Amino acid sequence: MKEIIGIYGTAASHWVGDGFPVRSLLYYGDLREHISPFLLLDNAGPAQFAPTDKRRGVGTHPHRGFETVTIVYAGEVAHADSAGNSGVIGAGDVQWMTAARGILHQEYHSEAFARQGGTLHMAQLWVNLPAKDKMSAPRYQAIVNADIPRITLPDEAGTLRVIAGEYQATHGAAKTYSPVNVWDLQLNADKEVYLQSPATHTTLLVVLQGNV
């Protein structure tokens, strides 16, 4: 059993652009080595949006030296960047963008989602790059839900998706520079689960919905 260093509550909400109402659940400036190599985790939504023809989101902006991992739970997000990558990710999909030596990108609600309206919920995790990899070429991984390994937990406790790293010899879909495990866990009500992680790893448990 690992020592619990701290339990942190929900931060105040703020807007990123005009499309993402965000709560920053983790921030490197406060926790530093306790969450390395992770820098930040934002939880956007769940939020309701009315149908519109207007583009909602964040215009072109730069990133450098780290990776952004966007996990969509509801709605659709469209991405485009200066390396020529573009695409739409929907519920269950993951976008893993490596900014490395530098990239410009933009994120908006997809055109179809904007016109239809509905619930948007996503999380975005920032992962620091090792010093030796910070000047690597930018990279973009669009990972659809069907390509993410899914494990059924014992006693009908729920499911675990292995986005990156591995869990019980099941390897995740994303290619990473740092040895990290990113698991997306859906735990059913009144159930419990015991998860093993490497003794040398810092472990973060982030509750996006519900209570533990």
Regions found by a protein language model. Give the residues of each.
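Short helix/loop capping segments that flank catalytic or ligand/cofactor-binding pockets
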Residues: H34-I35, Q48-A50, A80-D81, Q106-E107, ...
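Ligand-binding loop in jelly-roll beta-barrel domains
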Residues: A99-K132
